[in-house]
């Protein structure tokens, strides 16, 4: 999905940074809530499509009032999406404003996992099931690995701060920084100069636990 989004933006370089961020949040939000959005669309009698999911997420996931959404789409017919059709306006107005989740949703839909996988996860996670699945519904943190050949964590943190990007030390890896908020890390000089790379802190820990020494050959086997 990230490659599709990046390719779409590459073909539309006129889109500003704020709009890029807003569009990205919409796309990722819809992906994280696909099952729940589908459930809501069925409740209000709407056909599932990319557009209907975005409209539903704008109301259910971002708290936009249906009336405000109607006015917003009617105010910019040149660059914005097409105004709502009468049928779209009908079902959008039926959407509640209390969020994506509902007590009537089956567990697999509420937790955004296939039924068969939910059964297996319940067996393996037991009492931690709900906490783990709730975490998967949240945006992932942006972790960075400091390149020790070029910098140290404190120096890399200062370099990023100079570009307006605040970070905090990782909790476990001595080489990790975690971005506070979402920022275009790849556009920073610190990233271009190789001071940091984007890498999950868990992956950094795996690399440390292998005990790799200079001269060793490593096979990075990714399932």
Regions found by a protein language model. Give the residues of each.
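Active-site proximal loops enriched in glycine and acidic residues that flank catalytic Cys/His/Asp
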Residues: 148, 181, 200, 222-223
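Class I SAM-dependent methyltransferase Rossmann-like catalytic core
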Residues: 18, 190-197
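Conserved class I S-adenosyl-L-methionine
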Residues: 215-222
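Conserved hydrophobic/aromatic pocket- or pore-lining residues that grip, position, or stack substrates
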Residues: 144, 198, 206, 222
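Glycine-rich helix-loop-beta junction characteristic of Rossmann-like nucleotide cofactor-binding loops
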Residues: 188-189, 208-214
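Class I Rossmann-like S-adenosyl-L-methionine
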Residues: 1-187
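Glycine-centered loop/turn positions within well-structured domains
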Residues: 142, 204, 216
């Amino acid at each position: 999905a990230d490659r599709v989004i990046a390719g779409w933006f590459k073909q539309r370089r006129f889109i500003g940074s704020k709009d890029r961020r807003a569009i990205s949040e919409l796309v990722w939000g819809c992906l994280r809530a696909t099952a729940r959005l589908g459930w809501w669309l069925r409740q209000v009698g709407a056909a599932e499509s990319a557009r209907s999911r975005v409209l539903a997420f704008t109301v259910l996931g971002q708290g936009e009032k249906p009336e405000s959404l109607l006015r917003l789409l009617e105010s910019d017919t040149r660059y914005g999406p097409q105004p709502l059709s009468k049928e779209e306006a009908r079902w959008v107005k039926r959407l509640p404003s209390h969020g994506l989740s509902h007590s009537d949703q089956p567990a697999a839909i509420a937790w955004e996992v296939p039924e068969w996988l939910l059964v297996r996860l319940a067996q393996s996670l037991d009492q931690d099931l709900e906490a783990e699945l709730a975490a998967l519904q949240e945006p992932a943190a942006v972790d960075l690995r400091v390149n020790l050949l070029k910098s140290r964590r404190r120096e890399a943190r200062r370099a990023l701060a100079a570009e307006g990007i605040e970070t905090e030390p990782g909790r476990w890896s001595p080489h990790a920084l975690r971005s506070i908020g979402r920022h275009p890390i790849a556009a920073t000089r610190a990233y271009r100069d190789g001071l940091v790379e984007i890498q999950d802190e868990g992956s950094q820990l795996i690399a440390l636990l292998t005990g790799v020494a200079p001269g060793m050959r490593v096979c990075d086997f990714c399932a």
